[in-house]
Amino acid sequence: MATVNQLVRKPRAPKVDKTNVPALEACPQKRGVCTRVYTTAPKKPNSALRKVARVRLTNGFEVTSYIGGEGHNLQEHSVILIRGGRVKDLPGVRYHTIRGALDCAGVNARRQARSKYGAKRPKS
């Protein structure tokens, strides 16, 4: 236990909490421009061609964002919205692209979990 005199000289340091999504700067989403759209292979034991985009954000950060869902219309210079959320089998991918916002179209013919993929309600 520190004495009063010790605390007067050197106060207690507040705990610093580390964020998993530093590029968002405590915002729920950020806008950015795709600088490169490509596919990458996941870590073992998984096998696929995961779609990702390198994005230059409005705050100057350059991050890698995962593009979820089947098919996408993104290319270089597309303006997209990203949110936090890592992809466990892709090292260095800590952000997700929000489907159905800005230049990123929603997933076609999506029936379930539509809100997560920007898909409109199908005509019954």
Curated annotation (Swiss-Prot):
By its UniProt entry, which InterPro entries does this protein fall under? Answer: NA-bd_OB-fold, Ribosomal_uS12, Ribosomal_uS12_bac
Q: Which GO terms describe its cellular component?
A: small ribosomal subunit
The record's Pfam families line, in alphabetical order, gives: Ribosom_S12_S23 (PF00164)
Q: Name one GO molecular function term.
A: structural constituent of ribosome
Q: Which domain of life is it from?
A: Bacteria
UniProt KW keywords: Methylation, Ribonucleoprotein, Ribosomal protein, RNA-binding, rRNA-binding, tRNA-binding
Record carries keyword RNA-binding: yes
Question: What NCBIfam families does the record tag this protein with?
Answer: rpsL_bact
Purpose of the protein = With S4 and S5 plays an important role in translational accuracy. Interacts with and stabilizes bases of the 16S rRNA that are involved in tRNA selection in the A site and with the mRNA backbone. Located at the interface of the 30S and 50S subunits, it traverses the body of the 30S subunit contacting proteins on the other side and probably holding the rRNA structure together. The combined cluster of proteins S8, S12 and S17 appears to hold together the shoulder and platform of the 30S subunit.
Report the family membership: Belongs to the universal ribosomal protein uS12 family.
Oligomeric state and interaction partners are given as:
Part of the 30S ribosomal subunit. Contacts proteins S8 and S17. May interact with IF1 in the 30S initiation complex.
Q: What is this protein called?
A: Small ribosomal subunit protein uS12
UniProt organism field:
Shewanella amazonensis (strain ATCC BAA-1098 / SB2B)
Underlying gene: rpsL
